[in-house]
């Protein structure tokens, strides 16, 4: 088992002079070590690499998604675990390293998690207002249910979670400098 998974993760960030190459990022570190051993590239600055580099990651993720689907269809829980580990390895590990995002991935992940959690409602009143707004907006009947100390609004016909009126989109742009954005978008 990875040593960094056994400790609380607290990497250095913008104010640190240490290169992201040396940050401890669970899952990414193991792939970095593998790539170093195999002579494969690791990027440490945000980049859109050559097409063959990102296509390798894309194709590998798609292959593993297919293996996941096949394992589920067969009822093969070991195959499911294998596919999920491979998906994580390729997407979080290789994807992060091929795009030079090691120094950004953890804070970005936390931002996405906070955004996802904002889909729930803190109060009954917020849930009731969310039901009203989402029902009008989407023209679908909605209802809410209390789950623990939160309220979740669902579309009634299929139980799809509807976003709270206080939902916020993750702001991932905040993790890039203007220069990094210019260099990677061509603008």
Task: Enumerate the predicted regions with their spans.
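Flexible "arm" and connector segments at domain edges
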Residues: 2-187
